[in-house]
Amino acid sequence: MFRGSIVALITPFRNGGIDERAFQDFVEWQIAEGTHGLVPVGTTGESTTLSHEEHRRVIQLCVEVSRGRVPVIAGTGSNSTEEAISLTRFAKEAGATAALVVTPYYNKPTQEGLYAHYKAIHDAVDLPIVIYNIPGRSVVDMSVATMARLAKLPNIVGVKDATGDLVRPLRTRIEIGPDFCQLSGEDATATAFLAQGGVGCISVTANVAPGLCARMQDAWARGDLAEMARVRDLLMPLHHALFVETSPGPVKYAASLLGKCAEDMRLPMVPPTQATRDVVRAALVKTGLLT
């Protein structure tokens, strides 16, 4: 259903509010550069500091600008099941292709609680759901067994795997089968994830290098391993630079250097230090994205 380079979109801010024009232009640029899909209001989009009204507005803008040219997988997760249902219902009404639903954070549900959470969303809204498993932020790790149970539900179509465990996609593929869409949530290991059964990456780096990220994924898809490796190696310093500090600080700064938006964030997120800025700028230059 989904493949390739799918960008985890930043949310531009200006003067305390969402910079809608910058966001619209950014989505257009992503599509023009060859990005295969869009994820608004995920972790990188600072969804946790958006109001519900703002969250819905960003989804709506993304769907309107993309006009069906690429899939829109809207972030609709919450640690409240009812809230996740409400956001997912809005995403469907807005015309999103699917929903990206993060595992509930902070309240640490059991595996049975995770199953019940996703089943409730699945049963309430007729929209494809991609599970977002990111234990480093949510402090809960969905097991392969739980995911296999959920995969029996017709609208649970895949996972964004940000576990960092490169054995996981192989185990998941063996347990669930090749039709379950596995997308990497880690840029630095995206190509290794492909070799283990993945079909793409929901990428932070694609915010500032959409053409290169798409080219790398396309090279894999057509079996051009030499080109894939060349682009992978070119991107590696940038992958590192964008996570020297907590994302999305570095990637927003990088986007500001490219003239795509201001680097503004909302507290408790703060702009990166000068040392991080220097690393990010150097990586953009080395990758050929900045002179």
UniProtKB/Swiss-Prot annotation:
- Pfam family, any one: DHDPS
**Gene assigned in the entry:** dapA
Q: Which organism is it from?
A: Rhodospirillum centenum (strain ATCC 51521 / SW)
Q: Where is this site: Part of a proton relay during catalysis?
A: T43, Y106
**Residues engaged in binding pyruvate:** T44, I202
Its protein name is 4-hydroxy-tetrahydrodipicolinate synthase
Q: In which pathway does it act?
A: Amino-acid biosynthesis; L-lysine biosynthesis via DAP pathway; (S)-tetrahydrodipicolinate from L-aspartate: step 3/4
Q: Which GO terms describe its molecular function?
A: 4-hydroxy-tetrahydrodipicolinate synthase activity
> What interactions and quaternary structure are annotated?
Homotetramer; dimer of dimers.
List UniProt keywords, sorted A-Z.
Answer: Amino-acid biosynthesis, Cytoplasm, Diaminopimelate biosynthesis, Lyase, Lysine biosynthesis, Schiff base
What family is this? Answer: Belongs to the DapA family.
